[in-house]
Regions:
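Soluble catalytic domains of membrane acyltransferases
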Residues: 4-193
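Long, charge-rich alpha-helical interaction segments
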Residues: 193-253
Length: 253
């Protein structure tokens, strides 16, 4: 763990506890290390990596959009465990650029550290309670790391769900839920036979894992209706109208 990462982690752990009224962790990981790729929803832009890193034990390296990395910012971002990820919408040769990034990710996992990836690839301008389709990059990185290590160590992948009543409202509530993990080593023979098929199937499985960890409104046209129903019934994760007697774990379900 780099000193600046530790300092920022310590400061934010306290300040975010002041910002949020209640913070609930469901199935939190118990170890700082573990070679696990955590794939999270990306509901609240800048807030998501802060709460996932600060309120859960694992030491993580963040996959961050590449356009924030400049010759001046790169050393600072690296010191707080941030790695660039190149997307097609960034207008660069993603395959060539990401090959270098995958190599760095493999070194991170080989060092018994963890990765945090926001699998949707981007966040909505307006906070909505739904999961967009998950990209295949997280699973690709996992198998790339296993090949880098000659399959000598175990690499896991798990889903993380960030559930906010309202991410930017002070003294609102937050629940972070973690799914069971998948050991990618178990799929070695299938991967070596048909890698694309295995990557696609596991990506779908991880997507379902994340959906089960959040309040997921599958139809985007029903998100406003869902919010209105929560207000009327005083159930769910609405930040204003809710029954305080209902446990936060029950509300996000």
């Amino acid at each position: 763990m780099r000193p600046l990462y530790l300092f920022v982690w310590w400061c934010l752990s306290y300040s975010l506890r002041l910002f949020y009224r209640r913070i609930k962790l469901v199935n939190p990981p118990k170890s700082f290390f573990g070679r696990t790729i955590y794939v999270s929803n990306h509901a609240a832009s800048f807030m998501d990596p802060l709460v996932v890193a600060c309120f859960r034990k694992p030491i993580v390296f963040f996959m961050t959009r590449s356009d924030v990395f400049t010759p001046l910012s790169r050393p600072l971002l690296w010191s707080v465990h941030m790695l660039p990820i190149y997307r097609q919408l960034d207008g660069v040769n993603t395959k060539e650029k990401n090959a270098e990034v995958f190599q760095e990710c493999s070194k991170v996992l080989k060092g018994n550290r963890n990765l945090l990836i926001f699998g949707e690839g981007f966040t909505d301008d307006v906070f909505v309670r739904r999961l967009k389709p998950i990209k295949k990059g997280a699973v690709r990185i996992g198998f790339s790391a296993l090949e880098y290590m000659n399959w000598s160590e175990k690499v896991y992948i798990a889903g993380v769900g960030c559930n906010y009543t309202e991410p930017n409202r002070m003294r609102s509530d937050l629940l972070i839920s973690t799914s069971e993990s998948i050991c990618l080593n178990d799929y070695r023979s299938d991967y070596e036979t048909n890698p694309n098929k295995v990557i696609s199937e596991l990506t779908i499985r991880v997507e379902k894992f994340i959906q089960s960890q959040i309040t997921h409104v599958a139809n985007p046209h029903l998100t406003e209706l869902h919010e209105e129903i929560m207000i009327l019934t005083r159930k769910g994760m609405n930040s204003i109208c809710f029954d305080d007697k209902i446990d936060l774990t029950s509300r996000f379900r």
